[in-house]
């Protein structure tokens, strides 16, 4: 699919209403920028072509009209060849020179004259590279044989028959130039093999390297082919490749290589496919091989089998060379004393035996040392020697890490086992030997073997004589059989009695269940768990405390008075009896909710709290109280604020002030006109305005020109309505109209009765505050409305028409000459309304522009002044348009406000 063309106006960067001058300027600018001689970008030529095409169409009125009407289709039919004047001439010239319409019965072997099409502009032509390629391909092989022939003519009869000559040239012209490739193969191959052999095997013996280099001459092919597959001269390896056991020397004699097992070649050695001497590569013994040689239990078979079968799963085979290889000096195969002390199983067992032997001597019982037999000791010695060989190959850092690990293991074995006080005379201890495993040079012991096998895995609880002396000793009541602890019993009974005393108060009962620390602090004391005492008196009996749930604390934001880290002080009192009435002391801080507790609901809404029997009942009661509280209408104490100002209006007004400031600076004025005086910011509120029931305040910024014309201002807002029966809140959109007054200079305030929010107890009042945005060019003073006009100095001297601005629109006035700067002109009955039938005066202040006009053109400063004043007129018309749209959208008669609402409009006095 052809690529879509760009819009011509977009190419030149113009709009569709551009004139011829704009087209010429844009074309010259872009042509200089993208001309291929100046711009070396790869797409400069294409862009330059688009610029030429766009200029050709848009500069022609007829083509431009067709393009604007039909697009590219309107100019493609006639514009494709409009860029070349001689396109058709060159086209017919090509047909004539090609001889396409000559005698067609003649042979097609006539050579056509190749004439290069002239490349014109950037839209027509033929690639020169393509022509040169086709010419070279056609004549490259016959130029040498056609030198004696005359130049060809334009007629078919003069073309000679060159087929015979071409065959002669092919046979004789290059016969002597073909080199003998086979003659130079021997010496080239010998040199390559010699060089590659010296690079691949740099560390072999000198005699073997010389023998390899001299054997690079290739024998006859028949000798090699006859011996392939003969097991006497070679073998197939696991990969299926044939490996030779020898080679032919230069004299053609077979030379045997050193006999080695083919499969013993290491996987790490590198071989090449082109060389037949891979089997002769020497094998070096590594550090691991030397260790295997010292401890290898099985000999290595080096006999060469007659025929080697490929293995399905090859395994690495350690091979040894015929010459001994010295071990590296850095490897020291000597056991270190630290490893012997930590890794020896005999000594580790001895540390355990020593503990058991002391008790065995006291009871005259055989110890573990006597039960170990000689074969087991020999096994331990062999294992120790194997560990020493293994750790000798480790790095120093790894050995130190091993020592630390095993040292920790020994310490855990010696100190983690508690002393047993079981009578050894009853049962004989039989200690099993610890089993050990070796992995990567480390020895691991199974410590479960140190447990006495004949004992119960869960021993009985020790007697009171064996417990810690620091712990309190509980006493046992012989009559009841219950165990009591004096200190803990006092603390528990104190808390229980305090709860019993507070249970009569429902609020205290709820607070009690919301305190998690009363039951958790005692549990955290480092004391043994003892059963709680119970009171048998039915009147003073208290239900057990339920478990604390985190839900109520998170829901109602209760904070416990006692933190979890505090300890409850205990007081020594006598235990309670069945008939004794105890008065508990205040042993804990009082349980009181913090400031974040639930606010007290209204008396009528929340029922009286009953005595909760369980913790769940108390939680349900609080949830129900919170639910009722949430359903009640919330009456805010502060009226809600609504700002109806359009944010874009304030942004545009700031830009407007910045432009006027710059213009006044050019006129050698201050930031405002001299007659514009800043009014005092004071507010006089009508005492008849009652703001007691106001619950909604609407605020909006309005331009002063709307006040000067006493327009209606549309107020739109949304109020809330709460149904007292269902407690459902709905909203209602209201539109009001406020009559503005030209006397308001800072703000206007009006109160509308019953147009505020309704929270279920009746509608509140609405307060409307309209703040005035001061005008830049208009100000209302005591004598009338003042404004300004900018006059060109020549017009002020000679006289003429000037633009004068009134409160509604601008008009032209013909003035006489001789007007001085800052002169004042009064226009009667053109100001603002004084009464319903009479208007005030309009005072116009005339100022000179700082520059004079040139010729018949308009003064630039006067035009800028005119545009800035009309910005305020646009704001006035925007407000009128909003009112017109609202009135047009009304389908029914609008409900008018009562007269009292309009009479409540507050205005400022002068």
UniProtKB/Swiss-Prot annotation:
Q: Locate the J domain: which residues?
A: 4-73
Question: Which GO cellular component terms are attached?
Answer: cytoplasm
Per the record, where are the segments of Polar residues compositional bias? 451-462
One of the entry's Gene Ontology molecular-function terms is:
unfolded protein binding
Membrane-crossing ranges are none
Q: Which stretches does UniProt call biased (Basic residues)?
A: 111-121
Q: Which UniProt keywords apply?
A: Chaperone
Residue spans with biased composition (Acidic residues)?
357-379
Looking up Gene3D superfamilies in the UniProt record yields: 3.30.70.3600, DnaJ domain
| Residue ranges with Low complexity bias | 273-283
Tell me the segments the record calls region Disordered: 102-160, 260-408, 451-486
Listed GO biological process terms: chaperone cofactor-dependent protein refolding; protein refolding
Query: Which PANTHER family does this chain map to?
Result: CHAPERONE PROTEIN DNAJ, DNAJ HOMOLOG 1, MITOCHONDRIAL-RELATED
Q: Please give the name of this protein.
A: DnaJ-like protein MG200 homolog
User: What organism does this protein naturally occur in?
Assistant: Mycoplasma pneumoniae (strain ATCC 29342 / M129 / Subtype 1) (Mycoplasmoides pneumoniae)
């Amino acid at each position: 699919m052809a690529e879509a063309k760009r819009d011509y106006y977009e190419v030149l960067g113009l709009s569709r209403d551009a004139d011829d001058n704009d087209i010429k300027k844009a074309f010259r600018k872009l042509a200089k920028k993208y001309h291929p001689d100046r711009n070396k970008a790869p797409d400069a030529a294409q862009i330059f072509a688009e610029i030429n095409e766009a200029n050709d169409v848009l500069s022609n009125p007829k083509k431009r009209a067709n393009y604007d009407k039909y697009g590219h289709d309107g100019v493609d039919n006639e514009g494709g060849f409009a860029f070349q004047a001689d396109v058709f001439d060159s086209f017919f010239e090509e047909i004539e020179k090609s001889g396409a319409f000559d005698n067609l019965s003649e042979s097609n072997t006539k050579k056509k004259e190749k004439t290069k099409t002239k490349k014109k502009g950037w839209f027509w032509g033929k690639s020169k590279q393509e022509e040169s390629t086709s010419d070279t391909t056609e004549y490259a092989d016959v130029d040498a044989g056609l030198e004696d022939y005359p130049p060809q003519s334009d007629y078919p009869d003069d073309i000679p028959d060159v087929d015979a000559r071409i065959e002669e040239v092919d046979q004789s012209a290059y016969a002597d130039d073909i080199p003998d490739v086979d003659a130079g193969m021997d010496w080239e191959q010998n040199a390559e093999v010699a060089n590659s052999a010296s690079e691949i095997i740099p560390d072999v013996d000198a005699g073997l390297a010389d023998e390899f280099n001299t054997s690079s001459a290739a024998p006859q092919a028949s000798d090699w082919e006859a011996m392939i597959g003969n097991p006497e001269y070679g073998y197939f390896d696991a990969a299926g490749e044939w490996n030779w056991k020898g080679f032919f020397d230069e004299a053609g004699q077979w030379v045997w290589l050193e006999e080695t097992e083919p499969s013993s070649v290491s996987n790490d050695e590198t071989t090449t496919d082109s060389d037949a001497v891979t089997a002769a590569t020497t094998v070096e013994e590594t550090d691991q091989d030397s260790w295997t040689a010292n401890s290898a239990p099985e000999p290595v078979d080096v006999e060469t089998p007659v025929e080697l079968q490929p293995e399905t799963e090859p395994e690495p085979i350690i091979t040894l060379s015929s010459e001994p290889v010295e071990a590296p000096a850095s490897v020291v195969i000597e056991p270190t004393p630290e490893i012997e002390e930590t890794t020896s199983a005999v000594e580790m067992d001895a540390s355990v035996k020593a503990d058991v032997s002391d008790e065995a001597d006291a009871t005259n019982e055989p110890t573990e040392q006597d039960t170990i037999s000689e074969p087991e000791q020999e096994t331990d010695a062999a294992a120790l020697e194997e560990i020493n060989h293994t750790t000798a190959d480790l790095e120093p850092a790894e050995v130190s890490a091993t020592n630390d690990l095993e040292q920790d293991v020994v310490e855990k074995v010696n100190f983690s086992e508690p002393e047993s006080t079981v009578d050894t005379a009853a049962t004989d201890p039989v200690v099993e030997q610890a089993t050990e495993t070796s992995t990567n040079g480390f020895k691991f012991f199974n410590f479960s073997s140190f447990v006495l096998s004949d004992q119960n895995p869960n021993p009985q609880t020790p007697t009171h004589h064996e417990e810690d002396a620091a712990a309190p000793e509980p006493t046992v009541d012989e009559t009841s059989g219950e165990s009591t602890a004096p200190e803990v019993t006092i603390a528990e009974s104190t808390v229980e009695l305090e709860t019993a005393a507070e249970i009569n108060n429902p609020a205290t009962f709820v607070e009690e269940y919301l305190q998690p620390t009363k039951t958790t602090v005692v549990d955290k004391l480092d004391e043994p768990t003892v059963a709680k005492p119970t009171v048998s008196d039915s009147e003073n009996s208290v239900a057990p405390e339920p478990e604390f749930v985190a839900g109520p604390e998170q829901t109602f934001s209760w904070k416990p008075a006692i933190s979890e880290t505090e300890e409850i002080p205990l007081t020594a009192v006598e235990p309670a009896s069945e008939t004794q009435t105890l008065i508990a002391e205040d042993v804990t801080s009082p349980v009181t909710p913090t400031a974040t507790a639930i606010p007290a609901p209204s008396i009528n809404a929340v029922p009286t709290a009953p005595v909760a029997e369980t913790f769940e009942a108390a939680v349900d009661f609080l949830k129900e109280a919170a639910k009722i509280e949430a359903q009640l209408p919330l009456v805010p104490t502060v009226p809600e604020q609504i700002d109806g100002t359009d944010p874009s209006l304030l942004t545009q007004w700031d830009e407007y002030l910045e432009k006027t400031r710059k213009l006044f600076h050019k006129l050698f004025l201050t930031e405002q006109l001299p007659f514009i005086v800043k009014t005092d910011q004071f507010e006089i509120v009508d005492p008849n305005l009652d703001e007691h029931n106001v619950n909604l305040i609407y605020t909006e910024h309005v331009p002063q020109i709307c006040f000067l014309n006493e327009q209606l201002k549309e107020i739109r807002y949304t109020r809330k309505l709460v149904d007292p029966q269902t407690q459902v809140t709905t909203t209602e959109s209201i539109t009001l109209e406020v009559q503005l007054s030209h006397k308001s200079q800072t703000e206007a305030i009006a109160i509308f009765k019953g147009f505020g929010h309704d929270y279920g107890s009746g509608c509140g009042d609405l307060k409307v505050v309209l703040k005035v945005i001061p005008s830049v060019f208009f100000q209302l003073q005591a004598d009338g409305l003042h404004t300004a006009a900018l006059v060109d100095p020549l017009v002020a001297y000679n006289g003429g028409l000037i633009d004068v601005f009134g409160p509604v629109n601008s008009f032209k006035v013909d003035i006489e000459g001789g007007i001085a700067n800052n002169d004042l002109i009064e226009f009667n009955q053109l100001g603002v309304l004084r009464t319903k039938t009479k208007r005030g005066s309009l005072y116009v202040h005339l100022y000179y522009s700082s520059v004079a006009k040139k010729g018949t053109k308009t003064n630039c400063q006067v035009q800028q002044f005119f545009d800035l004043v009309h910005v305020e007129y646009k704001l006035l018309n925007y407000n009128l348009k909003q009112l017109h749209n609202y009135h047009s959208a009304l389908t029914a008669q609008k409900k008018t406000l009562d007269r009292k609402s309009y009479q409540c409009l507050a205005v400022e006095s002068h």
